[in-house]
């Protein structure tokens, strides 16, 4: 399995902080050859302004195997993010840890030995965003889960409502007539 190394303050694999969008796109296409069985498949690339700051541009790069999110400041990559999908075909490592196949709690504990963390929740086990400023790494997950939640009656009541909602997917949601 291909290995992609995350280097704090440097980059992810061949994608380096400080690259222009053209340089980064070329490096990404080179990296893609290493993980993709269909390297001829087009990679979708788009850059757009998402804030009022004219110096900040967001780049999105995706194909069937991967999704990268890049923030450009003044034309240079200031942040490079890699999404979990690529972990199906490559091992993505930071400080030797497989970042998408290691429990979040273990990763957070390990990184806290190197740096202080800023978390969006008081309970670190239930946060969704973690920022380690000294090592220059941000971690994100859509929702948090920890086994201790299964002991919380309020959580279990909410989850029961979610499960009941899921039952609707036993039935079709659309029927189409074609001529």
Map each language-model feature to its residues.
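Non-cytosolic coordination micro-motifs
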Residues: 1-52, 79-179
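Hydrophobic/aromatic-rich structural module bridging two neighboring secondary-structure elements via a short loop
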Residues: 50-73
């Amino acid at each position: 399995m291909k290995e992609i190394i995350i280097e704090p303050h440097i980059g992810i694999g061949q994608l380096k902080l400080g690259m222009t969008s053209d340089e980064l796109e070329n490096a990404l296409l080179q990296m893609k050859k290493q993980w993709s069985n269909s390297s001829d498949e087009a990679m979708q690339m788009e850059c757009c302004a998402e804030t009022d700051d004219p110096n900040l541009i967001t780049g999105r790069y995706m194909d069937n195997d991967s999704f990268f999110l890049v923030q450009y400041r003044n034309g240079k990559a200031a942040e490079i993010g890699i999404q979990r999908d690529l972990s199906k075909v490559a091992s993505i490592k930071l400080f030797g840890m497989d970042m998408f196949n290691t429990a979040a709690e273990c990763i957070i504990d390990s990184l806290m030995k190197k740096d202080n963390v800023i978390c969006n929740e008081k309970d670190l086990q239930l946060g969704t965003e973690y920022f380690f400023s000294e090592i220059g790494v941000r971690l994100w997950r859509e929702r948090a889960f920890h086994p201790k939640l299964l002991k919380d009656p309020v959580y279990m009541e909410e989850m029961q409502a979610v499960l009941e909602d899921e039952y609707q997917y036993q039935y079709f949601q659309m029927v189409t007539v074609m001529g």
